[in-house]
């Protein structure tokens, strides 16, 4: 304002120029600024100083068609369809599911909506998600063939966002979160899971539910750079004791075990041991992000889980039909 805007407003030579000449001088400057803004976005990885500049590592996008990917011999999967349905955590698996499709010859059908989970194991899904859930199930019922596989992905852990981790005791917060899974909520979660699984089992498809993944008090993308080190939003840190996560997911794991015993079509896939050490789970491991934010996988995290997920699909497809 003081060094550019005000001097330009009072510059006598400019005031004496015809408006057309001023416009002719301004247009190249506007074009230059626009080109600079475009280049900043288009070449973010080259010009950014942030450790998050590598979109391939951080973003959970569909695997690029131009990027080479070694095929895998999995004839039992070739031609089958993989239906992926759920909330934003279903979308966060896109790197992994697109890679497994290219490697094995599967066809992926994706339906996701943020905040609308399938079988979240915590409570009933929100009322405004029922239309999406019914639409997704109807699509699967209409298009799936016996032997196809359905991945139901969701946030199945109580969220750790929004707490003041500097002032509040972590164990008290964890106890508060566990208390939110009241008997009524637990029963509603079970009822919804049974309704969904019963409908899918009648189709002759196989169902995969991902067990509750790690989650964190701060988001890796926001809190990995040195200049955010003192941001209050990053105070919770990018690691969690594994014992705390096991405690937070214990009720959901117990329900999953009961559902798996009740529905032979259900397979529980648990990525947590692949993402955590014996004592600690970290959002960033050896400089590589496993998670993008508090609870969504990164592109690198997807690639870490790919071999396990692919083998799970092969094992399912190799079993005798139900």
What positions do the PLM features span?
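Extracellular/periplasmic envelope-modification machinery, especially enzymes
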Residues: 2, 6-322
